[in-house]
A protein has these predicted regions:
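Hydrophobic alpha-helical transmembrane segments
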Residues: 4-8, 53-58, 80-84, 116, ...
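Short helix-coil transition sites and intra-membrane helix breaks within transmembrane domains
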Residues: 114, 126-132, 161-173, 201-210
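Core transmembrane alpha-helical segments of multi-pass membrane transporters/permeases
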Residues: 76-84, 88-134, 150, 159
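Hydrophobic alpha-helical transmembrane segments in multi-pass integral membrane proteins
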Residues: 64-68, 117-135, 186-194, 239-249
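Long, contiguous bundles of hydrophobic transmembrane helices that form the permeation core
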Residues: 5-103, 220
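Small-residue-rich segments of transmembrane alpha-helices in multi-pass membrane proteins
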Residues: 40-42, 110-124, 175-186, 235-240
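Hydrophobic alpha-helical transmembrane segments of multi-pass integral membrane proteins
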Residues: 120-122, 145-187, 196-197
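Juxtamembrane and boundary regions of transmembrane helices in multi-pass small-molecule transporters
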Residues: 2-45, 199-250
Length: 250
């Protein structure tokens, strides 16, 4: 719940900004005569017999509820249990809509393995980069920046997350190095936590990010050249805008 008021404002602002920007990009493309490509192997959409849209909220509520209840006892493992609860809830609520359950499980497992491999490779790269002398020199330079400590902390975390290609990986590497320094300067722990959480979601989704690679190459079967720009706008520019707003509010 650290600085939750700022988090709520920033999250709402980012969601609205991203939605409006994405709608504008789609409208501009349609006006220019662009259309979606149809490829062999694309899933065929169903027009009837779909579950009620409200049932999509039930698994989300299950994830949030289980994570909230088990957070104190299981710590980070609570997220894994919560996601499993969400998957099982989808299965129970929409059981009659599954046509080929083994096929769905097979595709889901394959997608999960690809995502794990991509993310592990990128985070592993970041862990190796952490051991280099240049990384230590970069951290020293970032922590010695003049001005507001929250600003220098946000810059440091953003750049480290960009180097590792992972928000969580960037936090895992940055916090043990940066938190003692900034807390020693008297920075409020709640404000530091919120800034770090938001800052790690900026440059983390550069082209080498595991999620970006999986989404563009694996899921959409596109190239970075044709598909990365909209993703860059939504996952880099919008979060950086949210970070600036958070710093102004804090």
């Amino acid at each position: 719940y650290a600085a939750w008021q700022v988090s709520l404002v920033v999250a709402t602002l980012m969601a609205v900004t991203g939605f409006v920007w994405l709608k504008w990009m789609i409208s501009r493309s349609l006006t220019a005569g662009e259309r979606y490509d149809v490829r062999d192997g694309d899933p065929q959409p169903k027009t009837g017999g779909l579950p009620h849209p409200a049932t999509g909220l039930i698994p989300l509520a299950a994830v949030l509820g289980v994570a909230f209840v088990l957070h104190d006892s299981l710590k980070q493992s609570a997220l894994i249990v919560a996601l499993l609860a969400g998957v099982l809830t989808v299965l129970v609520v929409n059981r009659k809509y599954f046509i080929n359950l083994p096929h769905a499980v097979s595709n889901g497992t394959l997608g999960a393995l690809i995502a794990i491999a991509n993310t592990a490779a990128v985070v592993g790269f970041g862990a190796i980069a952490k051991l280099s002398p240049a990384f230590g020199a970069a951290v020293d330079s970032l922590t010695s920046l003049p001005g507001d400590p929250l600003v220098s902390a946000s810059i440091a975390v953003t750049l480290i997350a960009g180097l590792t290609g992972s928000a969580s990986g960037g936090q895992a590497i940055a916090l043990p190095l940066l938190a003692p320094h900034y807390l020693g300067l008297g920075v409020d722990a709640n404000a530091l936590h919120r800034v770090v959480a938001i800052a790690s979601g900026g440059l983390d989704s550069l082209p080498h990010n595991g999620y970006v690679v999986t989404t563009i190459r694996g899921v959409c079967r596109e190239t970075h050249k044709s598909a990365y720009w909209p993703m860059f706008c939504m996952t880099v520019l919008v979060p950086l805008f949210g970070l600036i707003v958070a710093l102004l509010l804090l």
